[in-house]
């Protein structure tokens, strides 16, 4: 049997939190964001480009929202038209049927068979 040493032998970091910090740095990297060092002219160009990009993204988002609003209103109008045309078809379309032929949860078929676990 080996003789137990009197002092604690530490080959790694001095305490537990340092080792956790080292693991976090290794896994996730350093989260500190370095500021860009630019001359004033380059900084102004950078700001103009960022502003233009934000405006572009804002306009795209508004366009998407308008498209979705239009789709929703068209669906609503179509449902109302169906309701006026045929009440039975409207009820069938609006019912949440459990006996669907292809449920949403069904996996898509693939060309290869699934892997069997060993």
From Swiss-Prot:
A Pfam family: MRP-L28
InterPro entries: Ribosomal_mL40, Ribosomal_mL40_fung
Record-level Gene Ontology MF annotations: structural constituent of ribosome
GO cellular component assignments: mitochondrial large ribosomal subunit
Disulfide bonds, paired cysteine numbers: none
Keywords: Mitochondrion, Ribonucleoprotein, Ribosomal protein, Transit peptide
Keyword Plastid belongs to the record: no
PANTHER family registered for this protein in UniProt: 54S RIBOSOMAL PROTEIN L28, MITOCHONDRIAL, LARGE RIBOSOMAL SUBUNIT PROTEIN ML40
Subunit structure comment from the entry: Component of the mitochondrial large ribosomal subunit (mt-LSU). Mature yeast 74S mitochondrial ribosomes consist of a small (37S) and a large (54S) subunit. The 37S small subunit contains a 15S ribosomal RNA (15S mt-rRNA) and at least 32 different proteins. The 54S large subunit contains a 21S rRNA (21S mt-rRNA) and at least 45 different proteins.
Descriptive protein name: Large ribosomal subunit protein mL40
Biological classification of the source: Eukaryota, Fungi, Dikarya, Ascomycota, Taphrinomycotina
């Amino acid at each position: 049997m080996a003789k137990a040493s009197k002092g604690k032998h530490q080959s790694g970091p001095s305490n537990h939190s340092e080792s956790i910090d080292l693991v976090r740095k290794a896994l996730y990297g350093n989260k500190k964001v370095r500021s860009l060092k630019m001359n004033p002219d380059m900084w102004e160009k950078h700001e103009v480009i960022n502003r233009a990009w934000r405006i572009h993204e804002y306009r795209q988002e508004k366009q998407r929202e308008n498209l979705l609003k239009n789709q929703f209103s068209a669906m609503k109008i179509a449902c109302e038209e169906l309701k006026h045309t045929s009440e039975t078809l409207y009820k069938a379309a609006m019912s949440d049927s459990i006996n669907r032929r292809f449920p949403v949860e069904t996996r898509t078929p693939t060309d290869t068979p699934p892997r069997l676990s060993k």
